[in-house]
Amino acid sequence: MPPTGEEPSGHAESKPPASDPMSTPGTGQEQLPLSGIRVIDVGNFLAGPYAASILGEFGAEVLKIEHPLGGDPMRRFGTATARHDATLAWLSEARNRKSVTIDLRQQEGVALFLKLVAKSDILIENFRPGTMEEWGLSWPVLQATNPGLIMLRVSGYGQTGPYRRRSGFAHIAHAFSGLSYLAGFPGETPVLPGTAPLGDYIASLFGAIGILIALRHKEQTGRGQLIDVGIYEAVFRILDEIAPAYGLFGKIREREGAGSFIAVPHGHFRSKDGKWVAIACTTDKMFERLAEAMERPELASPELYGDQRKRLAARDIVNQITIEWVGSLTRDEVMRRCLEKEVPVGPLNSIADMFNDEHFLARGNFACIEAEGIGEVVVPNVIPRLSETPGRVTNLGPPLGNATYEVLRELLDISAEEIKRLRSRKII
């Protein structure tokens, strides 16, 4: 939701208890694997910049290039805080960065940017295709400036194809990729597949993988390369068998609600106390265990529903049996009985549930990080968990331009007088 301009009220009880430090990523002083790698993040919002966040968590130096007036729009997206230039979304997702303000629409700004490119390893951008070229920052120009440069370009539809110039956001990518078509109940309006911009995160994950592969190639050859990711195609890639099912059999998968066309019971069920559980029975053995948890082992007999094909043929009946059983018990009772019989089961957690869940806490899934001008903020911790080189969160989303002077003075060796002149002309 858009920022309100008001500082949200604090709730002391919302802070998760401290976890075992040995289970928390990055609590030591170990050398991080990407130390010495410099990343320029010149994108906005999440699609692409999130890849920079991942690299930063494992030691890369990330320079966030922003327009001097206002910076990344992500700063104003989400829940407002005491800092005018930082929502909670910005603090959480723009972690492990230094902010450098440069106006790329001015020629002197482009010249400064190219000096940074010459001293960097990776460049990440997510503008509409053609924008960088309009600024005089085409791939040939960048490659000539730094032949070892690795450039990740994330856009809604990729750098080629008839739709390349269209605006791209996660919501549109979910629709175009087929994900939104699958979300919702049969015959009803398709719904958002969750409220998070999944496509932006998924595209960034593929982008981060591409960068690591390109770094390996650079080690072997000394050459950089261009990485092109369309948000829609990143989402399409994770939709399992919908492409081969249509290609071979002309089958179009439709919306299935909380269930699955290949298994039953396999969905969300409401307990007597109004809470929800997820139950997944994808094999005959799992259903046999569920029948035992229900204290109705006869349901898993060959004559009734012991065979997957019979359960699928009687989907409504099997689901109704499960609905009635879960509805007769509290969620804790359902969980206990299923876990005793090793039935795959889990609660549908709200964030409040997660803050108090012993497993989240034992795994160190929360990091409490001090944010300048705000105080301590709880954010998701680093994954993946590496045994020898765990990542860490060093800082949350930085104030606008907090490292401009440092980077220009120390990295580019620009005089204090020249920096003052550039600032007066609003180039930085």
Curated annotation (Swiss-Prot):
InterPro entries, sorted: CoA-transferase_III (IPR050509), CoA-Trfase_fam_III (IPR003673), CoA-Trfase_III_dom3_sf (IPR044855), CoA-Trfase_III_dom_1_sf (IPR023606)
Compositional bias ranges of the Polar residues kind: 21-31
Region (Disordered): 1-31
GO biological process, one term: carbon fixation by 3-hydroxypropionate cycle
Family: Belongs to the CoA-transferase III family.
Its biological purpose: Involved in the 3-hydroxypropionate cycle used for autotrophic carbon dioxide fixation. Catalyzes the transfer of CoA moiety from succinyl-CoA to L-malate to yield L-malyl-CoA. It is highly specific for succinyl-CoA as the CoA donor, however it can accept L-citramalate instead of L-malate as the CoA acceptor.
Name the record gives this protein: Succinyl-CoA--L-malate CoA-transferase alpha subunit
Organism encoding this protein: Chloroflexus aurantiacus
